[in-house]
């Protein structure tokens, strides 16, 4: 009987530990993937090319109004073209088919745990552009990784359920290098844009 209790206790402890990962001091590590992943169909059809771009905080330098809307609120693509100065784009990465599949797999799965909450700020520096076989932009997803917020084309509206930390990791994996990860980086970006005349305050 004594051996039976020891065996049952061991099985119970092992099965409980199997369900979560712990760090060195035994505190559970929260993963970005939830237990119940909901997978959806991607709404854009006819995608020929997927492009990742990065730029300095668009809110600091984008002064172009579009249809009377201020840069913060305007549509970022109209008539299949960007409505902001595309010369400010610092990096462009065209995804291969394998990378496209990995990106779309992240986008179609509602994987983010509820504790990743958006902040009041919005300092976008990254965007996904979806193009058709005529190289026209048919959809976009712009986001601010540090503020946990995004702006999307209407055909992707409400589709963002992935964790920004996961998307950030994917951008880095695919070759995007421009990230502002702390206040020092932010200050350097601001001073650089000011020195180039993009900021007047």
Where are these regions (language model features)?
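Positively charged n-region of N-terminal signal peptides that target proteins for export
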Residues: 1-4, 17-18
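Hydrophobic alpha-helical targeting segments used for export or membrane insertion
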Residues: 5-10
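C-terminal motif of bacterial Sec signal peptides marking the signal peptidase cleavage site
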Residues: 12-15
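Function-determining sites in protein domains
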Residues: 17-201
């Amino acid at each position: 009987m004594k051996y039976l209790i020891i065996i049952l206790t061991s099985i119970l402890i092992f099965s409980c530990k199997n369900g979560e990962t712990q760090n060195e001091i035994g505190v559970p590590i929260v993963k970005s993937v939830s237990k119940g992943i909901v997978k959806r169909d991607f709404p854009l059809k006819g995608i020929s090319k997927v492009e990742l771009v990065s730029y300095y905080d668009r809110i600091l330098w984008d002064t172009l109004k579009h249809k009377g809307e201020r840069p913060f609120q305007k549509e970022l693509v109209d008539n299949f073209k960007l409505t902001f100065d595309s010369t400010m784009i610092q990096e462009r990465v065209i995804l291969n088919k394998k990378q496209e599949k990995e990106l779309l797999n992240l986008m179609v799965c509602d994987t983010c745990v509820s504790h990743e909450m958006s902040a009041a700020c919005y300092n976008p520096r990254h965007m996904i552009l979806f193009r058709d076989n005529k190289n026209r932009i048919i959809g976009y997803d712009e986001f601010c990784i540090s503020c946990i917020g995004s702006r999307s084309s209407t055909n992707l509206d409400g589709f963002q359920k992935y964790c920004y930390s996961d998307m950030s990791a994917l951008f880095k994996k695919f070759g995007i290098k421009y990230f502002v990860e702390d206040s020092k980086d932010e200050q350097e970006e601001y001073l650089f844009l000011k020195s180039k005349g993009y900021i007047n305050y």
